[in-house]
Amino acid sequence: MQFSTTPTLEGQSIVEYCGVVTGEAILGANIFRDFFAGIRDIVGGRSGAYEKELRKAREIALQELGEQAKALGADAVVGIDIDYETVGKDGSMLMVSVSGTAVKTRR
């Protein structure tokens, strides 16, 4: 399965549009992990623990997107958009959502 944020794939023709596909992943905030991340893990203004969790959530969302596309018979997803949003009481969770168009391609 190929993924692209662009509307086309270099060297390939889109022969069929299969539909819009989506994927989501929600990260819950853990107060103790958050506290220790703030003390131990911030180096140069970045938190490795948070970055690792965000990467994992993005991978889960993209995996869901790919599974939906495959179920539609697609071999690629184009025009992918990745969004991050806080949800829950007091923004206590982070949602990663991805969407795109499932397509069939030909070289």
Curated annotation (Swiss-Prot):
Highest rank taxon of the organism: Bacteria
Organism expressing this protein natively: Salmonella dublin (strain CT_02021853)
PANTHER family, A to Z: UPF0145 PROTEIN YBJQ
Encoding gene (name): ybjQ
Homology family: Belongs to the UPF0145 family.
HAMAP family: UPF0145
Listed name of the protein: UPF0145 protein YbjQ
